């Protein structure tokens, strides 16, 4: 695997970790009776970023 692909894979995993953190924060806030910290728009932004990274990784291989 090339260094470029390793970097892209790391960025994809970091994005997935951000999404999991966002989900956990929203679940915690819901359990406390608070409104979500992250909206659908925030998740859509992360999804679009992950999509761009996946296309870049596909083109790099």
Language model features: what each stretch is:
Residues 1-27:
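N-terminal acidic leader/helix
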């Amino acid at each position: 695997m090339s260094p470029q692909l390793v970097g892209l894979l790391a960025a994809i995993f970091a994005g997935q970790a951000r999404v999991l953190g966002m989900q956990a924060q929203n679940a915690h806030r819901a359990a406390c009776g608070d409104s979500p910290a992250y909206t659908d728009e925030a998740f859509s932004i992360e999804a679009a970023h992950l999509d761009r990274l996946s296309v870049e990784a596909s083109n790099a291989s």
